[in-house]
């Protein structure tokens, strides 16, 4: 029984690799005409929904408000600020002297900041870190929609646009609506469909 389970896993991994190989080797017109536009829509529609919400609520850059509830304001933003300084100044990620008598920054980095997307904050000025965090939420929700579309399409072997609709529901689910301010957990939601 373990051999058949192993063979099935190998076949699934091979299909997954072939899927990505085909996406990146086809020319753009063939990609769009083959029904794969649903992947683009899976990413773009949540972004557009967030943009509309940001406009309605006046959240930066469409207004002067920020989305900073609870721990995102009091805890996460200072962590991201410290990460920004460490990246920009080439400082060590192991220890920080910038809070109290100093502390183990590697533990903070491992739990809160280790997502590769978080390093993008170093591309922006320090004073807009809260705005960048708002847009990281948007990006991670869009990635969650995209990965769920990939999973549903491959698992059910379909090119139906309904997979995109379900994936958008996943990316804009009640859990994400309530807890999207926990930026570090959004990565788990984004990669869960690929596991």
Predicted segment positions?
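Start-transfer (signal-anchor) and selected internal transmembrane alpha helices
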Residues: 1-59
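Hydrophobic alpha-helical transmembrane segments
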Residues: 40-44, 135, 164-168
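Membrane-water interface of alpha-helical transmembrane segments
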Residues: 32-40, 101-104, 130, 134-137, ...
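Transmembrane-helix signature of polytopic, membrane-embedded enzymes
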Residues: 149-171
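Membrane-interface coil-to-helix junctions
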Residues: 49-148, 168-190
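Membrane-interface transmembrane helices that cradle and orient dolichyl/undecaprenyl
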Residues: 195
